[in-house]
């Protein structure tokens, strides 16, 4: 069976070594030594210059904290083409998602349509760097500055991505990332919040720790968003293998690029200035019927791509279902092909043959 992705498991002896440290420290959670070590190592690996990272227990909690701090119950301009967590976090935090359609080439929010969606209730722009492809950061920053809005980037897919020689996590007021087991770098389950402002860092920190600033001081409202030492142990075991993981995925991407027939398929256009991370391989069919036919043929031989992202989020039952033509069209026709470390050539070849036929 070939799934759309496969979790990278580090050598078990390396993971056991980290777990033995947890036992030696007799410390399982509450900002332990392994969590703090992983924060430091990630900052170095990602070459963060201005931002600091706070590790959390999953990839959605950072979004919820960002929206609690910056959304303030207002209208959030956002994309309908993302994983459901992006919209769910907005609604969960009692904010209102205002969907802006996407650019059909880059698949990110169409920056030219943002200003017309701004009202006196708008507090924030929440945009997703889809499949690791950056939004038009400069234009979004200009709009936010002009209208005194905050910017949150859902960078769940973006571990290792650089934009104009800087980590993608350096942009926006807050950026968030997922370290779920399906991601390039993972901690089994986990996530990170990246922030430049010292004041906003402090607010984000106490927000993920019940509001604590020290054992007996409370600086504000908080929840339990802390990463455990077991999660950090997995992250510390995976991180040394990132070069191998990226190289392997690039080889698979190169094979797809070289062998797929793009006369009947479209590819996502990467934005100029991006150093991509080979996180997903989406292809866009000419029609939903051709996608479904191809999907059924792949499934018949044990190959399971995913319809990321389907449906378009403006179709969710708990939001105002206002049509978004580009997002709905792309969502119905896009398929992410299997992509993970150490894919076998025979599997890649079979996928290409079926898709091309």
Describe each PLM feature range.
Residues 88-90, 143, 230:
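Hydrophobic/aromatic ligand-binding patch that stacks against planar heteroaromatic rings
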Residues 105-187, 194, 336:
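Active-site phosphate-binding strand-loop segment of PLP-dependent enzymes
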Residues 93, 146-147, 301:
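Helix C-cap/helix->beta junction micro-motif
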Residues 66-118, 124, 297:
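Conserved PLP-anchoring active-site segment centered on the Schiff-base-forming lysine
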Residues 1-71, 127, 145, 332, ...:
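Conserved PLP-binding active-site segment in aminotransferase class I/II-type PLP enzymes
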Residues 64, 81, 135-136, 160-161, ...:
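Short N-terminal helix/helix-N-cap motif within the alpha/beta-hydrolase-1
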Residues 35-41, 45-54, 112, 124-128, ...:
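PLP-dependent aminotransferase class I/II
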